[in-house]
């Protein structure tokens, strides 16, 4: 089962594509991505790069459940789901390749009927 609740649509030549309402996520092995950019780019895998991937959930319970699924799939929980300084609820995990993911719910967001994330009006 997919961690984010959406199964991958397809995998092609080592790239996994996940279609979400209004966007796509493409997961590509870091070595292959570096090679695609330039054979002269070294692959560095330690520390925090300053970049996270974020996924907005529909509820606090969804945040907890997604983090649990990530952990069951082998992810390392970095920050357990909790209330945030900005009024939301989020947690972080590091995936098997070491990328950091934030799973968050915020009171200022809402989902449209077709699943697109929007800012609430007058939020």
Regions found by a protein language model. Give the residues of each.
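A short, acidic/glycine-rich surface segment
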Residues: 34-40, 110-112
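Vicinal oxygen chelate
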Residues: 16-19, 39-123
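Core segments of cupin and vicinal oxygen chelate
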Residues: 1-34
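Short coil/turn motifs at secondary-structure junctions
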Residues: 32, 58, 106-108
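Residues in well-ordered beta-strands of folded domains
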Residues: 26-28, 54, 104
């Amino acid at each position: 089962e997919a961690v984010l609740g959406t199964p991958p649509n397809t995998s092609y030549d080592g790239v996994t594509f996940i279609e979400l309402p209004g966007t796509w996520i493409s997961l590509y092995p870091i070595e292959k991505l570096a090679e695609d950019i330039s054979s002269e780019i070294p692959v560095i895998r330690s520390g925090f790069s300053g970049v996270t991937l974020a996924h907005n959930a529909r509820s606090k319970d969804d945040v907890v459940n997604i983090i649990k699924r990530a952990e069951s799939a082998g992810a390392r929980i970095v920050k357990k789901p909790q209330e945030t300084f900005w009024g939301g609820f989020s947690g972080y995990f590091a995936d098997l390749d070491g990328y950091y993911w934030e799973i968050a719910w915020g009171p200022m967001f809402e989902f449209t009927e077709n699943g697109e994330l929007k800012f609430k009006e007058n939020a």
